[in-house]
């Protein structure tokens, strides 16, 4: 992370120093428990927590300064601003404007993080600065931008996530992307965004606020939304083989195909499933059974080509990539094979994961479906959960468990025999049941349900 001159921080934020530090500042941190010597602590008010209460702890941890809304009579130098979160955004925007290398902005309803990780891999991890985990909100984006350094990095890949109106205005304005990537527009965060058209309109602001004329790479079905139709002249459109082309110049269209690869690991084990993406006659094997991940990998490949990565490096890096952070892969523990995709969920990603799990599991193996509720779907939540429940075709030897509120778990279970399913509000209540099951186990749900707690291993890391 680059160092900052205290006077620059004051200029970017419009703040005033009280006891200005005499040394350069070595990065930013908003969690006093994780402060490193030389950093500046940002006192943010997050939910019920007020960062101003932790100034002394930050100082003890080695902070050389703090950004505050209200100063405290302690030795620690403090930069007083009107709003700490706005100040953080101003710092992120300032550092973005100083970065001279290509910046890729990624958004979408699902698949943002896996697409970001794939593109980071394709561009070369050692020289690519990217969002950590899914740190993609009003705090995460400027914190990510604060690590930009043109002397150390050749590319930046920044993920932007929203769940309410007007968020992307702030994020897109900070990111100022040179290249935009949209994974998809699906039913996610409907609670505050209310419709798919509204979601598309909000997410399109990433491209609207990007560098003038910067391209946007997207799948053809995203052009059904008015917000993206307006951007079609800037689009690089991925089109599945056999699908009619939109009315665009041929140079804007990239044909691709996703095909499945299977390797049988034995009569009592799940198949080793993977996907293959074909673009312009080149085949790229992908270590995930998810068709959604494969389709988004196609976006990352096209982005890497646009940014000048040579074909041999792209192919080598695609083959080396592995899903991470509990996002779409198979893992076997003795007599159990888990399909692990439990970082988050919405109706589209849930349907894709169920399809991948069912295709990856031989017919003779019993299946246990564990579905956490899908949050932030607003008034349509019950209908979406009921529709997903109807996708489960349980055989006599199969079982299901649904974790979440009574309303949503009952919606999941509406088409399933009570003798074959469990509805619960807490994952802890089904641990012993899962531990005793022999067969293939599906795990997916919204983040709050922590379905990874059902895994035998305690060493899986959600944010590698």
What are these regions, as identified by a protein language model?
Residues 106, 112, 325-327, 448, ...:
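ATP-dependent carboxylate/acyl-activation modules
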Residues 79-83, 255-257, 419-430:
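Short acidic-hydrophobic, aromatic-tinged amphipathic segments that line or gate anion-handling sites
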């Amino acid at each position: 992370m680059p160092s900052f001159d205290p006077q620059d921080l004051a200029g970017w934020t419009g703040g005033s120093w009280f006891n200005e530090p005499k040394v350069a500042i070595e990065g930013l941190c908003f969690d006093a428990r994780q402060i490193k010597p030389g950093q500046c602590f940002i006192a943010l008010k997050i939910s019920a927590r007020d960062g101003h209460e932790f100034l002394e702890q930050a100082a003890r941890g080695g902070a050389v300064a703090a950004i505050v809304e209200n100063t405290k009579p302690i030795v620690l130098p403090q930069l007083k601003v009107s709003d700490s979160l706005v100040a953080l955004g101003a710092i992120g925007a300032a550092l973005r404007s100083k970065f001279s290398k290509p910046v890729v902005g990624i958004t979408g309803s699902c698949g943002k993080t896996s697409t970001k990780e794939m593109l980071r891999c394709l561009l070369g991890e050692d020289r690519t600065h990217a969002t950590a985990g899914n740190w993609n909100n009003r705090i995460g984006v400027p914190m990510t931008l604060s690590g930009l350094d043109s002397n150390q990095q050749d590319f930046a890949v920044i993920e932007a996530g929203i769940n309410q109106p007007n968020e992307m205005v702030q994020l897109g304005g900070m990111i100022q992307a040179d290249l935009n990537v949209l994974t998809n527009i699906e039913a996610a965060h409907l609670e505050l965004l209310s419709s798919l058209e509204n979601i598309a309109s909000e997410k399109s602001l990433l491209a609207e606020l990007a560098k003038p004329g910067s391209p946007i790479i997207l799948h053809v079905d995203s052009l059904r939304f008015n917000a993206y139709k307006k951007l079609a002249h800037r689009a690089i459109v991925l089109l599945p083989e056999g699908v009619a082309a939109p009315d665009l110049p041929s140079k804007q269209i990239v044909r691709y195909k996703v095909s499945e690869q299977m390797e049988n690991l034995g009569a009592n084990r799940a198949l080793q499933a993977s996907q293959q993406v074909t673009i312009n006659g080149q085949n790229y094997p992908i270590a995930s059974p998810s068709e959604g991940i494969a389709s988004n990998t196609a976006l990352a490949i096209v982005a890497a080509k646009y940014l000048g990565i040579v074909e041999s490096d792209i192919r080598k890096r695609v083959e080396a990539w592995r899903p991470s952070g509990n996002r779409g892969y198979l893992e076997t523990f003795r007599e159990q094979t888990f399909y692990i995709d439990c970082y988050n969920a919405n109706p589209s990603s849930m349907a894709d994961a169920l399809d991948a799990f069912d295709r990856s599991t031989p017919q003779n193996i019993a299946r246990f479906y564990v579905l956490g509720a899908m949050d932030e779907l607003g008034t349509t939540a019950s209908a979406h959960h009921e529709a997903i429940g109807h996708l489960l075709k349980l055989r006599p030897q199969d079982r299901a468990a649904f974790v979440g509120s009574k309303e949503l778990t009952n919606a999941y279970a509406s088409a399933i025999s009570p003798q074959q399913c469990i509805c619960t509000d807490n994952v802890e209540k089904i641990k012993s049941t899962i531990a005793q099951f022999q067969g293939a186990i599906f795990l997916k749900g919204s983040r709050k349900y922590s379905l990874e707690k059902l895994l035998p291993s305690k060493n899986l890391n959600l944010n590698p």
